[in-house]
């Protein structure tokens, strides 16, 4: 499938635990292009006292990677985003533009600790939504409080949260229980986005083609296109609805 949008990738070099060099970023982009990806959301971590690269450095690396992407192949592009580690101050940080939203839109890629309580997740989702943000729960299959409790995922979705899972999890790279959980999310129409969560060319390599093939086989082409292309395309289309400035992304 061509035209895939990778909504979760640590492709900016030297700003977190993802790509470490510009050459590695280039190789990641080349691989993504070969696997049908045409847009990548660069999502460097932001976590207090752990991942706090300056926005100046992030912007510089983003511009370099975006320029490389343009030379990879027709239609290849990169948009700036961030993977926020959720804490009590996330709304304040977003309002203060400490880090960008996803492609300058109102969507926010939100990561929780694996052992976060469900009540904490629900409260933070409510805080974000009531302040005009649209939280995307990053790699939702990892959170212990959700486990195979699909009704909790449904409750978060009813609040207005969106769910992202990793491509590798869908095809069983994290075990059969996680694979089954992801499959049920698809069957219950609770999955909204898929990302590679790519971190480099040796660790968490940004593969997605096999996932796309699996999804087509199990759920059909129309569903796969909706999750991998159409849903993330809506983020780009609505970026001018974002809160404040567009944080370095392109606008029409």
Each language-model region and where it sits:
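Extended substrate/RNA-proximal surfaces in nucleic-acid metabolism proteins
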Residues: 52-164, 242-243, 248-251
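Short acidic/histidine-rich active-site segments
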Residues: 190-206
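Non-catalytic positions within long, well-ordered alpha-helices that form the structural scaffold/packing
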Residues: 33, 129, 186-187
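Active-site mouth loops of central-metabolism enzymes
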Residues: 11-22, 108-116, 170
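Mid-to-C-terminal alpha-helical segments outside catalytic/metal-binding sites
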Residues: 208, 212-252
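Active-site environment of divalent metal-dependent phosphoester hydrolases
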Residues: 46-50, 85-87, 142-146, 170-173, ...
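Active-site neighborhood of phospho(di)ester-bond hydrolases with catalytic His/Asp-centered motifs
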Residues: 5-7, 41-43, 79-82, 136-138, ...
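An N-terminally biased module of ancient metal coordination in phosphate/nucleic-acid-related enzymes
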Residues: 1-75
């Amino acid at each position: 499938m061509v035209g895939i949008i990778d909504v979760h990738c640590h492709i900016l070099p030297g700003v977190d635990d993802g790509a470490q060099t510009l050459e590695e970023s280039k190789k990641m982009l080349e691989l993504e292009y070969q696997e049908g990806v045409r847009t990548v959301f660069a999502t460097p971590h932001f976590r207090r006292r752990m991942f706090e690269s300056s926005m100046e450095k992030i912007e510089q690396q983003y511009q370099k990677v975006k320029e490389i992407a343009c030379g990879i192949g027709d239609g290849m592009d990169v948009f700036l985003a961030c993977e926020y580690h959720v804490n009590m101050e996330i709304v304040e940080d977003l309002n203060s533009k400490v880090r960008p939203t996803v492609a300058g839109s109102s969507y926010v890629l939100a990561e929780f600790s694996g052992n976060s309580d469900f009540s904490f997740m629900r409260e933070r989702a409510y805080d974000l939504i009531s302040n005009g943000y649209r939280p995307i729960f990053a790699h939702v299959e990892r959170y212990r409080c959700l486990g195979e409790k699909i009704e909790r995922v449904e409750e978060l979705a009813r609040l207005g949260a969106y769910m992202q899972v990793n491509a590798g999890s869908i095809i069983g790279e994290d075990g059969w229980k996680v694979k089954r959980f992801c499959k049920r999310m698809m069957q219950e129409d609770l999955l909204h986005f898929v990302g590679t969560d790519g971190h480099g060319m040796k660790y968490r390599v940004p593969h997605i083609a096999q996932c796309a093939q699996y999804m087509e086989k199990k759920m059909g082409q129309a569903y796969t296109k909706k999750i991998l292309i159409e849903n993330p395309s809506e983020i780009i289309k609505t970026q001018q609805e974002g809160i404040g400035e567009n944080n370095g992304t392109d606008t029409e």
